[in-house]
Design a protein with these regions (language model features):
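Sec-dependent signal peptide recognition
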Residues: 2-9, 196
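C-terminal motif of bacterial Sec signal peptides marking the signal peptidase cleavage site
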Residues: 13-15
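Bacterial signal peptide processing site
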Residues: 17-19
Length: 281
């Protein structure tokens, strides 16, 4: 069973550039550019079980360029990798205002043995399959009582900074929400149920790629992007909801093993046809 939401984080009609800095007190061996770095928000729980590498920040003095949240986070990830850190814990953030058009972020960075135990959200990745340990929520006692597990997935959308002279670029994510997703204790050894939930996450990624494709091909500008993005967002959400309903119905929530395997093959094939839109993190 899956609960689904779609969130749009949109449209800064300005231009700005971040100033990167920080203090590295315990540098570690640098990580490769392809190594995943976990980003934890201010409200996300975190207990350090590794080494605090230092502190980093992205600020700005006013109007410049390339400083949407997504762009800033990618620059902070690069700084963390160079210092050997695999976790970024945001300690303070400020939204654009009259003093600055940039997203400003301060964070501590850490090197931990296993970043997965600290995840509150999981961004879809072909090499990162769900485990029951990722289902960190408390099972419901009032709803979904007939299900052994519930997974919660979001599609998230953000644009870069946009001006009359600067065309929009869009960033999309398929996200698994660990603390909203849950599994009942009796189902923790059920590998087939886990495969069913993984396919729900794969369906979310499929429609993220469809959304990314439509956004990239739309050719929006600063004047028409607001309504155009809303239209695509709504349409993709409707399609994905129907696909998930059909998946649950035809597989009988994973109990029909033959149909379950068929759905897994179909979704894997559709993902492959849109592999150019995979998100590298």
């Amino acid at each position: 069973m899956m609960k689904l939401t779609i969130a749009g984080l949109l449209l800064l009609l300005a231009a700005c550039a971040p100033k990167m800095g920080g203090r590295i007190s315990a540098p570690q061996e640098p990580l490769s550019d392809s190594t995943f770095v976990l980003v934890l928000k201010q409200m996300d729980p975190f207990e350090n079980d590794g080494i605090k590498v230092g502190s980093i920040r992205s600020v700005d003095n006013g109007l410049s360029v390339n400083c949407s949240y997504y762009e800033v986070i990618e620059k902070l990830r690069q700084m963390a990798r160079r210092s050997g850190a695999n976790v970024i814990k945001i300690t303070r953030s400020e939204l654009p205002d009259r003093k600055s058009t940039c997203e400003r972020i301060w964070a501590d960075i850490y090197r931990v043995p296993d970043f997965r135990k600290h995840e509150g959200e999981i961004f879809w990745h072909p090499g990162r399959k769900l485990t029951w340990d990722d289902f960190k929520g408390t099972p419901s006692t009032t709803s979904y009582f007939q299900f052994g597990a519930v997974s919660s997935c979001d599609l998230k959308l953000e644009s870069n900074s946009v001006s009359i002279l600067k065309k929009p670029r869009f960033y999309t994510e398929a996200v698994f929400n660990c603390y909203v997703s849950w599994v009942r204790p009796a189902s923790r050894n059920n590998a087939e149920m886990l495969a069913h939930e993984q396919c729900h996450f794969d369906i979310a990624e499929l429609y993220r790629r469809k959304m990314q494709q439509q956004l990239d091909e739309a050719g929006f500008n600063a004047f028409d992007m607001q309504e155009g993005v809303k239209r695509i967002n709504k349409d993709i959400g409707r399609q994905m909801g129907k696909r998930n309903d059909a998946y649950d119905e035809e597989t009988e929530h994973g109990l029909n093993k033959t149909r379950q395997r068929e759905w897994e093959r179909v979704i894997a094939g559709e993902l492959d046809t849109l592999k150019r839109y995979i998100q590298h993190r």
